[in-house]
């Protein structure tokens, strides 16, 4: 084990023990955004006059982000260290102690759906493929062999990208069914109906069981294996097509970030655009996001059509929903909670509803983000489509997404497009 590995492991342990809530930094004068909504930070920080808590960083140490990307020697070692970025006593049911952030921003952040690891759900059958163990991390293999002997009853250590995808899809459906300005405490029945679609039960249309089943049959992903952004997007597309009553179309580009309007309209509706979720799997660099894409990536969260960004390294996927300056705010799926009993006709208790939301802020500097990600947009109608195209074409810096009127033909092996230089790389799950 080299010195770099030891240093990274030590840093990860420190991050787990010292996990201060981010402060509304005085040197960042920009507003904070949450999925297209802007919140000014110049309001009084504490109407009651109480002082904000001091940072918990260790003296003499630089700020450590809650989920700094690691450079580990193997996926097994990384999985073994994949502890939640939030200590157990700081889960979603605890209100934020910070008085520095605009209350309206915190209310909006808390109203976003947050899916995490769950345990004690109906077993997901194991694959009978003899090569399956080779695709699993060491911790998952051990748990499968000694604990979940009859199938997976928890997704700890392998389901974080699925949970991030569920969060993205649920918040898109929330905008359609509850409204963008919906906040917790209202429309409880409708909120419970939406959550029932994602229950950890094979009968629920967007359950982890359905994701795993489709991933195994169409994406080559074994039960217990970590999903990548591309496989997650394909699962969302297939499961949404099966669940007709959600009235949501899905347009997926897993081989790049080019959007072709003729293809999009075939899916969204040739006679008028109906609500359509656009999912783009991209890779914006090698080890980190290339700086030329920073501004375009920040702008994506500010678009009113944005439903967030899901992605990260294996065993470390996050769901990004906010931005301020160079920092991205995210929901962390790496917490294991008991599965909620599934009953589509019943209302969840306040305690169970609390486990799908958090007011606890977490953020990551853009330079620490992994370049592989799944970007989501919700286009509700023709006006939304026109506004989205206008915003994309006026972006500052290198654009991430390009829109074309027609699908372009495949280019020959020895032909090269002029604009192919410095282009966003298509995302392949196996590249991680």
Curated annotation (Swiss-Prot):
It catalyses: [protein]-C-terminal L-amino acid-glycyl-phosphatidylethanolamide + H2O = [protein]-C-terminal L-amino acid-glycine + a 1,2-diacyl-sn-glycero-3-phosphoethanolamine. Keywords: Autophagy, Cytoplasm, Hydrolase, Nucleus, Protease, Protein transport, Thiol protease, Transport. The keyword Cytoplasm applies. Its main location: cytoplasm. Its EC number is 3.4.22.-. One of its GO terms (molecular function) is protein-phosphatidylethanolamide deconjugating activity. It is found in: Cytoplasm; Nucleus; Preautophagosomal structure. Residues 74-97 are annotated as: Disordered. It is an enzyme of class 3 (hydrolase). The active site is at 160 (nucleophile), 332, 334. One of its GO terms (biological process) is mitophagy. GO terms for cellular component: nucleus; phagophore assembly site. Cysteine protease that plays a key role in cytoplasm to vacuole transport (Cvt) and autophagy by mediating both proteolytic activation and delipidation of ATG8. Required for selective autophagic degradation of the nucleus (nucleophagy) as well as for mitophagy which contributes to regulate mitochondrial quantity and quality by eliminating the mitochondria to a basal level to fulfill cellular energy requirements and preventing excess ROS production. The protease activity is required for proteolytic activation of ATG8: cleaves the C-terminal amino acid of ATG8 to reveal a C-terminal glycine. PANTHER family: CYSTEINE PROTEASE, CYSTEINE PROTEASE ATG4. Belongs to the peptidase C54 family. This is Probable cysteine protease ATG4. It comes from Coccidioides immitis (strain RS). The lineage of its organism: Eukaryota, Fungi, Dikarya, Ascomycota, Pezizomycotina. The gene is ATG4.
